[in-house]
Amino acid sequence: MLKKTLMNYKKLGKTDLEVSTICLGTMTWGEQNTQVEGFEQMDFALDQGVNFWDTAEIYSIPPREETFGSTEKIIGNWFEKTKKRDKVILASKVCGPMREYVRGGGNQFGKKNITEALEGSLKRLKTDYIDLYQLHWPERNTNFFGKLGYEHN
């Protein structure tokens, strides 16, 4: 049961998940914002009825090898501290082919890479599930406008 707030909620696709119409973006935590600031923002968001939170393995922004996954770690630390994982509808993303330091670069959307990305995110987030898992950036050789170039692996 969601806390009574002025927030509006919608069903997420064809699921039974009810998400707030405002989503908390987290991409600055670990670079531009500290863990303390991230905790304050998560507490405030949840108090206002914002239960839909977005993150990604590549965060914090700007992406750097030294801060890869830092935002997910901050969220995981908050989950561990507050025990409120069940109050949040969490979205995360596997990054696309963009950085050599992320599993060697290359095709990030193959089965092996997606599995490794998901397992890494779950560990950093200190949870056993992510409600919505997405592809962050398209692979440019994916089929489009009738042209073929995608190779399934």
For the regions a protein language model found, what residue spans apply to each?
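Surface-exposed, interaction-prone regions with an acidic/low-complexity signature
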Residues: 91, 98, 105
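Glycine/proline-rich, positively charged
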Residues: 101-153
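Active-site/binding-pocket entry motifs
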Residues: 18, 96-97
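Active-site-proximal loop/turn and secondary-structure-junction residues that shape catalytic pockets
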Residues: 28, 57-59, 94-96, 134-139
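Generic beta-strand or strand-like secondary-structure segments
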Residues: 74-78, 93, 113-120
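Short beta-strand segments at enzyme active-site cores
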Residues: 52-56, 89-93, 129-135
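N-terminal binding-site loop/beta-alpha segment at the start of enzyme catalytic domains
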Residues: 2-89
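Glycine/Thr-rich phosphate-binding loops of Rossmann-like dinucleotide-binding domains
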Residues: 32, 61-63, 100, 140-143
